[in-house]
Amino acid sequence: MNNTGQHGKFEKINDEFLNETFGAFEVLEAIQTKYGKTDNDTIINEARDAMVAKVLGYGNVNTDKHGWDAKMDSEEFLEVKQSSASAGHICATFNDTSLEKAEELGKDNVTIALAVWSSLRNLLFVVYGKNRKIGPDMKAKIITAKEKGHIRPGTQSISMNDLLFKYGFKIKLVNMKKEDIREFLKNKSGFKTYLIKENRQLPFYDEA
């Protein structure tokens, strides 16, 4: 029998950390009140989505929980996914995706962006692009997961290396230098084959 008490890493509560964090929350709470954004789960995501959208030239952010994350003044939409630089496997995760939404991911007017952050506010780079194959591929993943009886078949991921080398996305650097990103990615799951064994070059948006 599994002992659930063995799971996790338990440490004594750090009062200094607690006080400093809730002090920062007080500032955030004032912003929530000022702008009427009282949903704790979405305010940080909205701010991050807006920053990514701004970096990529999209002027409008979605303040609702449903739909694409940003759009241009034209009918060009942006779907933003976030990842931490400390993650061993960097990927774009699509939660509870319907078959209809999966199909729309491959539309010509939908760009997918994977933003990689080193901290709450430091955006390192964005991997973004579009590819018609993403829609059918995502749809096939969901159907296969349903057939296998997965509890959440609509939650699927696309690895950063697949976005770059399978779907032709490129990297836009924000707060990371080009000479540093290759070394950074060598230690990430999926990149060893491409960057070390095959010596593949990373595609950047400032290159033809």
Residue locations for each model-derived region?
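Nucleic-acid endonuclease domains
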Residues: 1-208
